[in-house]
Regions:
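Short beta->alpha linker loops
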Residues: 22, 53, 95-99, 120-121, ...
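Metal-dependent phosphoesterase signature
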Residues: 63-101, 105, 110
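Active-site neighborhood of HAD-like aspartate-dependent phosphohydrolases
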Residues: 1-43
Length: 253
């Protein structure tokens, strides 16, 4: 029998608006600290998000501007960026996405097991969860970049999560907001709902989805289903997720 037993949440851009509210200013603060004559604007950073991982973005941008950065310098920039990111999180400068807290609370009350699967480091995730949810931690475990050898878009993070949870794939749902994340969860053969972040994204042609939402919604901000089952309420809730699993199962058969 198909029923909702577990939800795997991506973090950056899915649970919280971290990319523009924390990661981007942290990068620019690091450049300033180290005397690197860069200042990424929003459009530049959005383009760089196609590259997965902070160190990879620094290396890619350096190459694109014909600058010869050593691995040591790239590592130093990234370490400094991480410091500034944590400082920004401590100041509670990051907001939850619309409907996230409401849905997480409802799933918790329904005894649906919840997990985070992210490319962020464990120190980043722990601090962000602590600041966003205070004493309430609904997540059973976290798969971070520290826990796997290969990050998204490789399926390994989600395969590890499935192994640890023991939940049948067809009884779980993934929430993702990016091409690398979607490729990771789909390659792991997990039912996946795409909820875009506040950053424009063009889905890669080889990504085939059966559920796309513009947001999770709440009482004052209605969710729109771009693709998938109909909403019973103005927002995504436990019933909708169960409907989606049936929809997903029927689509496969």
């Amino acid at each position: 029998m198909t029923y909702l037993e577990g939800v795997y949440w991506d973090l950056d851009g899915t649970i919280a608006n971290t990319e523009l509210e924390a990661h981007l200013p942290a990068f620019n603060n690091a450049f300033n600290d180290l005397g690197v004559d860069w200042n990424w604007d929003t459009n530049t950073y959005i383009k760089l998000l196609k590259i997965n991982g902070g160190k990879n973005r620094i290396a890619f941008y350096a190459k694109s501007t014909n600058e010869n950065f050593s691995e040591d310098l790239i590592l130093k920039i990234h370490e400094t960026k991480q410091f500034h990111y944590l400082e920004i999180i401590k100041k509670n400068c990051v907001s939850l996405k619309t409907g996230v807290f409401r849905l997480i609370n409802e799933l918790h009350r329904k005894n649906v097991r919840q997990f985070i699967v992210t490319s962020s480091s464990r120190s980043q995730v722990n601090l962000l969860v602590e600041n966003l949810f205070n004493c309430f931690n609904p997540f059973e475990f976290i798969i971070s970049s520290d826990d796997v050898e290969l990050k998204k878009p490789n399926p390994l993070p989600y395969l590890e999560a499935v192994k640890f949870s023991g939940i049948k794939k067809n009884n779980s749902i993934v929430f993702e907001d990016s091409n690398p994340g979607l490729k990771s969860s789909l390659a792991a053969n997990l039912p996946t709902i795409f909820v875009p972040s506040n950053i424009p994204i063009v889905l890669e042609e080889n990504i085939k989805l059966d559920c796309i939402l513009d947001s999770l919604g709440d009482e004052n901000n209605m969710s729109n289903v771009i693709k998938g089952p109909k909403l019973r309420k103005p927002y995504v809730d436990y019933s909708f997720l169960n409907d989606y699993l049936v929809f997903f199962s029927d689509a496969k058969n």
